[in-house]
Amino acid sequence: MSVPNSKEQSLLDDASTLLLFSKGKKRAEEASKIGSKTDTIEHDESHEREKKGAIEMAAAALATASTVSLPLKKATEQSAAEAATSTAAKEETENQPQKQPQWPVPDSYIVDPDAGIITCICDLNDDDGFTIQCDHCNRWQHAICYGIKDIGMAPDDYLCNSCDPREVDINLARKIQQERINVKTVEPSSSNNSASNKNNGRDRASSTTISDVGDSFSTDQDNTNHRDKRRKRNPSNNSIDSKNESASVNSSDGLTSMPKKKEHFLSAKDAYGAIYLPLKDNVFKSDLIEPFLNKHMDDNWVIQYPHKTFKSVSIEVKPYADIAYSRTYPGFTKLGVYLKKDCIKGDFIQEILGELDFYKNYLTDPRNHYRIWGTAKRRVIFHSHWPIYIDARLSGNSTRYLRRSCQPNVELVTIKLQDTDNRNDKSSGRKSSRIKFVLRALRDISEDEELYIKWQWDSKHPILKLIKGMTIDSLDDLERYGLINSVETILSNGECGCGNNSKDCYLLKVKRYAQSLYKSVKSRGKMNNRYKLNEILNQYNCKKRREPPILHRLEEKAQNTIERAPILLNNFYRQKFLNRNNGPKIPQKNTIDSTNNPDDIAKPFKFALFAQHSSNISVPKKNETSEKPLIITKSTDYDESHITNIEELPIPVLLPINKTSRQTANDVEESQSKNEHKLSRTPSLSNFNKELSKEAQHSQAKTKEIMTEASVNSRRESTPESIMHLSDFSSSQLHSKKKLSFADYRKKLLK
């Protein structure tokens, strides 16, 4: 038998020690049970037991040694070879490229961490107040559906069932959520915190500690242990007011809250009858409505009802779409009127009640926005023949929830009940009207089918052109943008009964066209469709034709001035000459004749003002024989400094002067140059400036000559000799005033 090595010897020593400890412990227990014995007997017995224990220990050691195989050296070599083989295999696996684990969901399934999307195994995507986020796909799930009942059970690393497939009780999760929906309860703390929540009402921030009268129960150890868990917790009641709620401290749990009372609220389906004033008969907003109805109750379109009381068909108000789990509130309740039993075409279904007023008052009220809508608002119906309307926005009956559609199945008609002797309303004490406004079926309507009435568009609304077969692109810009604005406003306050997927709805056609138009607007950030429409309208209002270059505009302006100036001057002087009396006589009084002469019609506006001023001045009447015009023979003899009456001032007369041959030649050259200028294309800027300066100098010289001639003629003697002398003087004046060019002036200096 070989000698055991150090390792084997240590194993034997440990075995003997354990055996000795167990025997000693057992012997001590037995000694405690025996009781009190003499010291001598105990000493003998202990000596025998020790001897016996040593024998047993030796026997156990020998038995243990016999179990060890003899060739220990060979086993050691074999274990060393196996260790070397495992080390080599490990190195080979490390050198080989490791395969990354494949997720069971594609990358497209992963969403943004702040998206706030809920995807749970219960197939309900609403927030129940306690959700947890997956670390891989960043989607949120109901914690209760995965068996997480409170915050303490939230794990540090969490994966949903899609990212980490495992056995989850889906039926139980659906049952829990269905029970929550059926209860329809809302905790008061969740309603208080709804304003501060983010990501569609779900706040992903860490929950705060519940406090009572300012005392804090959180500890540093709790914050360290649950730091990662708080990132995933989403209790809807993340903060509770200490005045309304209290907390109790438990030795095992750290923090627990008191049970909360559940408050039951009515849904829109059950509470619709409490948001309006129910009526039993129509209310007249104007005192003239009732006389109007009594006067026109025998019109042709009024239907004679064969009974004394109206018998209606049962209807029901219920939601046409479930908005309890929608992420955004549309701004209006989605309720409709449904029929409880079948009816055929022409049956009278239900009476419409509300406040009656004249159609004109609705149009003139700016709160109705009829200029934008172009139709009646929700719960308002226009009468098709009379200038009245029924307003059920504040009071009425269940027909106020009637929706409009492009394919209606009911219409509003007027019926007249049979006359009775005592038709008094017991509640109001007034005589009830025989005229009723009821709904009539346009076709056969089956049970549980929603009732629709037609849209009552204005006669000038652009949508009527679409109904007649025109397209939106065929409309002009003003009608197109007005139509988009009107339809967007209408759909933001209600929906058409045609549905969101109808191809025959004209409102949806306009909405789809507007959506394609909004895509063309480039916005820096998130922008509402209303703002995009305003941007389009602003661009349309500010849209102008691109202006030509400044030089081209200046040339056109100067060209127009050159062309218009001679015409305006000629017309002015011709009219001025025609408005003067021919002859050498200058009348001093009564220059304005009250008779309708042809010359007075063509007089300028200033003469009309002067005539109005002179008519207000009282002039003393004189005999017709004494009213003789004063003829001035010499202008130097006349002194006008002492004249105080404006009618006594002399008016200079422009005498016709024959043109000389040189003036005629200049006019011919003018006309030729003008024609050449018209036929030629746009000249260069330098040539144009030269022509402009020449034309301006010529027109100024011509105007100055005419004014000089007029002033000279008015002050010279009006004899034939003086006229001939004036013509000779004007011709010599023209020759003497000829301007020298720079070249001629230089030649003159050189001489």
UniProtKB/Swiss-Prot annotation:
Residues 39-52, 691-707 have a biased composition (Basic and acidic residues). Residues 79-88, 189-199 have a biased composition (Low complexity). Residues 313-456 form the SET domain. Residues 206-222, 235-255, 681-690 have a biased composition (Polar residues). Pfam families: PHD_5 (PF20826), SET (PF00856). This is SET domain-containing protein 3. GO terms for molecular function: histone H3K4me3 reader activity; methylated histone binding; zinc ion binding. One of its GO terms (cellular component) is Rpd3L-Expanded complex. It comes from Saccharomyces cerevisiae (strain ATCC 204508 / S288c). Identified in the Set3C complex with HOS2, HST1, SNT1, SIF2, CPR1 and HOS4/YIL112W. The modification Phosphoserine is found at S236, S684, S718, S741. Belongs to the SET3 family.
